[in-house]
Amino acid sequence: MLHGRGAGAKTIFSVEGLLDPGYHVLAITGLYNSAIDGKEWFKPREEIPGEITDAKQFDESERVLTENVEAHISRVRADRSKIFLWGFSQGAAMALILGLRGKVKPRGVVAMSGFLPTPVKIWKKFDTNTQYLLPHGSEDEVLSAESSKSAKSFLESKGIEAEYYEYKGRHKMSLESIAYVNNWILRLSEI
């Protein structure tokens, strides 16, 4: 699970108790200090959601996340068909990147209250085998639900299966949204 901007791995573990007890959760903290406290995966351009200001930070976060996820999969001998990436906000952007690049090859990606980073839109190749769930709060005051709807449209335009789910709430994980994600993961795990 990948946290949002201004948070850290500890915030993710507060959600772990609400998930299916069979899950093994790996949470990684962003590499960079955030201007709003906590950590972040890359420096965003405040005025343009999805834009990044430092491509090196973005690339380094992708590299470190890929290495950590791969090492963890090897260490616990995980079945790749049961690997899911789940990110919130800026962490959702990174989860989308890892899924689309195809290096990690997860079964599914949950990009909650997130956005598709601009660099992705110029890529030529995508891994189309991963399924995506894009939950977003209807009253999100940080990122409009349009950012997830736009990501869904982009994914589908590349032949990638994506589902948008809107829940009542602001820029946070609600009990309703966590339950929906939990059921989605369980459903895909059985296929």
Question: Which residues does each PLM region occupy?
Answer:
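Flexible "cap/lid" loop of the alpha/beta hydrolase fold
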Residues: D37-R45, G114-Y132
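Serine-hydrolase catalytic machinery in alpha/beta-hydrolase-like enzymes
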Residues: M1-A78, K82
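Short beta-strand/loop motif that positions the catalytic acidic residue
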Residues: L133-H136, D140
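A conserved short beta-strand
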Residues: V104-L116
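C-terminal catalytic histidine-bearing segment of alpha/beta-hydrolase fold enzymes
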Residues: Q131-L133, E146-I191
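Gly/Ala-rich beta-loop-alpha elbow adjacent to hydrolase catalytic centers
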Residues: G87-G91, A95
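Conserved alpha/beta-hydrolase "nucleophile elbow" surrounding the catalytic nucleophile
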Residues: H3-R5, W86-F88, G137
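Active-site signature of alpha/beta-hydrolase-fold catalytic machinery across serine-
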Residues: S14, I97-R101
